[in-house]
């Protein structure tokens, strides 16, 4: 049935669900959110999960992959049962946020609190970058938690490198959700500043998101008479798109991995980004395939303006020198080669078999 949240938004509320086996027989029924009828017994969600894990009969040769730690009911059952199987916990997002790094979290990420508290029962954490591994070890140590093995297996990969048949000169691309923390406004203002010195520069913005944020970004473009060289292209497949551009820019405040950074590097784009955790420093190497710019999360209005000018300077430096541009492009391909799908598959095989 349709129900209302406290903020008056609507959601689908569970009234009753019936689950069948392959023979069309009823296995169990769900009444509301936390009541289940199974073989004539009334169970809550914990009881049902407990029954499920008993039926699996896991042993020390089995592997249990845990993802999205915020579902505490799964965690309760898994750790209280002291299952014999190996337990690998995949950390997809940031585990710790300094003041200003995230709009929704500060310090230890509540999503992973349970895992960290019971880390002595975990065989391995899996993170996407070496930088996050180092930081996670430090955070667990600071909070006096046990430190299990920590494996680095990137959450993203590319099947192949995308070789360009020709890039539009002076072209820039950025791609992300249009939300505040991606700081597309910085990208736009930096491009406007750079365009004052090189009127051949163009920027295409791929992605959709919060309408108020998009409206604000479009207003910046319009107020600066930049509609002729800054375009909003919406959400679309970026396959065979990156390689048409010279330069990819990300001003995101935090990237646990940064799949678009990898895709841009795999397409031979030069890269510009802020030196923030963790993906930017993984895919952008200062002077090698782009520019990694120092950043402070507690910035004054004047320092933001200086940052915009600094990014504009880096844009002009890269696009005005074909030798630098070619060097950065070749090195991006070289860096992305480490993230080919078959190489990531080998990393999984190492821990699973």
Predicted regions and their residues:
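A conserved mid-protein helix/loop that constitutes part of the nucleotide-sugar donor-binding site
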Residues: 170, 179-193
């Amino acid at each position: 049935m349709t129900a209302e949240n406290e903020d008056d938004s609507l959601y689908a509320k569970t009234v009753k669900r019936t689950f069948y086996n392959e023979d069309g027989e009823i296995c169990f029924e769900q009444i509301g959110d936390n009541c289940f009828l199974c073989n004539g017994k009334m169970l809550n969600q914990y009881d049902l999960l407990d029954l499920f894990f008993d039926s699996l009969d896991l042993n020390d040769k089995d592997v249990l992959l845990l993802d999205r730690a915020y579902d505490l009911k799964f965690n309760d059952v898994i750790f209280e049962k002291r299952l014999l199987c190996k337990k690998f916990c995949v950390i997809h997002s940031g585990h710790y946020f300094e003041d200003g790094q995230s709009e929704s979290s500060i310090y230890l990420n509540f999503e992973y609190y349970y895992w960290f508290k019971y880390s002595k029962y975990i065989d391995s954490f899996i993170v996407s970058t070496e930088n996050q591994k180092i930081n996670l070890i430090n955070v667990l140590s600071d909070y006096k938690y046990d430190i299990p093995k920590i494996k680095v297996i990137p959450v993203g990969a590319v099947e192949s490198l995308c070789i360009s048949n020709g890039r539009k000169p002076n072209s820039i691309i950025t791609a992300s959700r249009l939300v505040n923390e991606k700081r597309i406004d910085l990208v736009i203002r930096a491009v406007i500043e750079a365009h004052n010195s090189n009127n051949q520069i163009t920027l295409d913005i791929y992605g959709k998101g919060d309408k108020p944020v998009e409206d604000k970004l479009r207003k910046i473009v319009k107020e600066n008479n930049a509609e002729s060289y800054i375009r909003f292209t919406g959400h679309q497949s970026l396959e065979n798109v990156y390689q048409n551009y010279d330069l990819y820019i990300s001003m995101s405040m935090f990237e646990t991995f940064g799949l678009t950074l990898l895709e841009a590097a795999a397409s031979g784009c030069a890269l510009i980004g802020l030196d923030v955790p963790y993906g930017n420093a993984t895919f952008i190497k200062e002077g090698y395939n782009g520019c990694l710019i120092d950043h402070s999360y507690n910035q004054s209005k004047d320092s933001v303006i200086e940052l915009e000018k600094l990014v504009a300077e880096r844009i002009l430096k890269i696009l005005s020198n074909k030798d630098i541009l070619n060097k950065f492009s070749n090195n991006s391909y070289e860096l992305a080669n480490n993230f080919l799908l078959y190489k990531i598959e080998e990393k999984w095989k190492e821990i699973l078999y």
